[in-house]
């Protein structure tokens, strides 16, 4: 569910702030080609491969997405949403629906329609080999006249041959990556994994992001990434969690099984790559000793049903974007967007006995 309101909410809640730890007795470009980035002659391919689609077709895909996404969001219609979203983005959007359904009607925000501004959209359409799954990336804005600050990936799903958005990342800057374009304005797709021409691949980037959350970047995070706003924010989430409950509880991050291993990479003008990937992590809040409880917040109601817990494990699915150099230098995490997709934990024993 890719409304700007919901995406803005997703960007920040990696450290859940809605729970309350308390004592048990208290309450709590043109149509013929994209040509929106600086052309780079070195990005040309030989022999020339066909682009994934034309710029006009890509704009039609974006327009269709906005239209159907609005219709689905208004009715919390998962089936309709499934016709324009897939992969990690669909899982994140469905969790938004679930959260909304857990709220009383009076607490639900009225839905506001939106659309992407095609006039400011910057298309990164790669040339692809015959038989290669088709995809493209786009820098988008949901406000007319405002520079794009969101990177989206659209892929043609083989099972039904339609284009769907699979990933979206809110960037920390409106300065977009310098994607290399050939003379006709098309990008060059490069392998996102096992690419010996890059300083890091998607698997290593994912490991580094998880380390930022889990250890504050001690093991791999600060070695792989330069200190950008995005990586600093992840490290701050970790450090804030360490002192969040004082001596009354703990908050710990860890990696989790990741169903979404697809990654997408485009060559950049400096010979490196823009890599778009996803990861999954957990945050487990727990009381330090008996006599304490965690009271779920209203946004957790769909999963936790207002039942006090001794611990809660939240699951987050996130989309990430990084620029990677061709030589052995740190990569730059330029944005990430997350959504809580599950929450669970053992109820307070006294509550279980009453039930």
UniProtKB/Swiss-Prot annotation:
Keyword Transcription regulation: no
Biased composition (Polar residues): 39-48
Cellular localization per UniProt: Cell membrane
Organism: Streptomyces coelicolor (strain ATCC BAA-471 / A3(2) / M145)
Keyword list, A-Z: Cell membrane, Lipoprotein, Membrane, Palmitate, Signal
Residues covered by region (Disordered): 33-53
Lipid sites, type N-palmitoyl cysteine: 28
Protein name: Uncharacterized lipoprotein SCO6871
């Amino acid at each position: 569910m890719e409304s700007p309101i919901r995406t803005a909410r997703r960007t920040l809640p990696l450290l859940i702030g809605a729970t309350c730890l308390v004592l048990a007795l208290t309450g709590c470009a043109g149509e013929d080609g994209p040509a929106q980035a600086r052309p780079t002659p070195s990005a040309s391919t030989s022999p020339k491969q066909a682009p994934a689609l034309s710029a006009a077709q890509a704009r039609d895909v974006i327009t269709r997405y906005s239209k159907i996404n609005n219709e689905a969001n208004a009715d919390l219609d998962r089936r309709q949403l499934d016709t324009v979203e897939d992969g990690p983005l669909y899982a994140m959007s469905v969790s938004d629906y679930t959260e909304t359904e857990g709220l009383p009607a009076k607490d639900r925000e009225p839905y506001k329609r939106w659309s992407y501004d095609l006039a400011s959209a910057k298309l990164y359409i790669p040339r692809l080999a015959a038989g290669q799954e088709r995809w493209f990336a786009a820098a988008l804005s949901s406000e007319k006249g405002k520079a794009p600050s969101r990177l989206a990936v659209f892929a043609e799903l083989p099972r039904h041959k339609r284009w769907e958005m699979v990933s979206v990342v809110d960037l920390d800057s409106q300065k977009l990556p310098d994607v290399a374009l050939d003379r006709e304005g098309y990008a060059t797709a490069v392998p996102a994994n096992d690419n010996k021409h890059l300083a890091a691949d998607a698997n290593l980037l994912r490991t580094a992001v998880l380390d930022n959350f889990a250890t504050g970047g001690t093991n791999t995070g600060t070695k792989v990434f330069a200190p950008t706003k995005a990586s600093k924010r992840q490290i701050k989430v970790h450090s804030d969690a360490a002192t969040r409950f004082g001596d009354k509880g703990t908050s710990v991050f860890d990696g989790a099984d990741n169903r979404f291993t697809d990654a997408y990479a485009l060559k950049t003008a400096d010979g490196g790559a823009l890599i778009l990937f996803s990861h999954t992590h957990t945050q487990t809040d727990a009381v330090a000793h008996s006599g304490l409880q965690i009271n779920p917040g209203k946004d957790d109601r769909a999963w936790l049903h207002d039942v006090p817990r001794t611990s809660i494990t939240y699951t987050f699915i996130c989309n990430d974007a990084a620029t990677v150099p061709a030589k052995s230098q740190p990569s730059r995490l330029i944005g990430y967007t997350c959504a809580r997709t599950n929450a669970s934990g053992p109820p307070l024993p006294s509550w279980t006995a009453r039930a």
